[in-house]
Amino acid sequence: MALQVDAPDVSSYDELYNRAVELLKHQQRVLIGLAGGPGSGKSTLCAILAKAWNERFGSEIVKIIPMDGFHYSLEELDRFDNPEKARALRGAEWTFDADLFYSLVRLMKKITDRELYAPSFDHAIGDPVVDDICVEPKNRILIFEGNYLLLNKPPWSDACKLYDIKAYLPVEHSVARARVAHRHLVSGLCATEEEAIERTDRNDMINLTFVEKNMVTPDIVLQQLRLKTVKTSSL
């Protein structure tokens, strides 16, 4: 199985950029909540946009804060009522510390004149890394990205009220399925293509449908990222 994503034309996302720049004229920091289901390409897009926008400004004005850092740790999942289910369905909305996420968004909104820290996620160990992302005063555009950032249930919906711009990256289900199964396989999370597909259908595709059915109205719906090549026997 081989899969790539076309590098997007950054100008296709100028509406998002222009809104952020306009807001910067009147406030010190702009918070963007960029949501999309599993396999939508949101992490890829955010990295591309951050690089392009930082180059335009000539400084590191953009900082990305992924939702992945707010996974409950494996140790915390093992304290759930059903730890086996929690581990098997890790990535579902309830396996994230949404209260911690909301608290951090609120902090980033309020405090702009000193360094703050957010957690990252280390895929090698399968757990969050506390205070791994440093947000500095020069980081005036913060892009929070993740599956559940636009959910219409608290505390996710409380965080939504703090975003200056709510953006959504849609994806076709067949595309998402191919991307996520490929990711599970190449990361070593699944040993075979069949196992990767089964895990994707059991968990990620359900999460994608949940995101689509339970989100607030975004301010901007972004252009989908396109698949360049998919070569596989099963997808």
Curated annotation (Swiss-Prot):
Q: Which Pfam families match?
A: PRK
Q: Name one GO biological process term.
A: CTP salvage
Q: Give the UniProt keywords, A-Z.
A: ATP-binding, Cytoplasm, Kinase, Nucleotide-binding, Nucleus, Transferase
Listed GO cellular component terms?
Answer: cytoplasm; cytosol; nucleus
Which terms does the record give in the GO molecular function aspect? ATP binding; cytidine kinase activity; uridine kinase activity
**UniProt entry tagged with the keyword Glycosyltransferase:** no
Q: Where in the cell is it found?
A: Cytoplasm; Nucleus
Pathway assignment: Pyrimidine metabolism; CTP biosynthesis via salvage pathway; CTP from cytidine: step 1/3; Pyrimidine metabolism; UMP biosynthesis via salvage pathway; UMP from uridine: step 1/1
* Chain positions recorded as ATP binding sites: G36, G37, P38, G39, S40, G41, K42, S43
Q: Which domain of life is it from?
A: Eukaryota
The EC number of this protein is 2.7.1.48
Q: Which reaction does it catalyse?
A: uridine + ATP = UMP + ADP + H(+); cytidine + ATP = CMP + ADP + H(+)
Give the similarity note. Belongs to the uridine kinase family.
Output this protein's name.
Answer: Putative uridine kinase C227.14
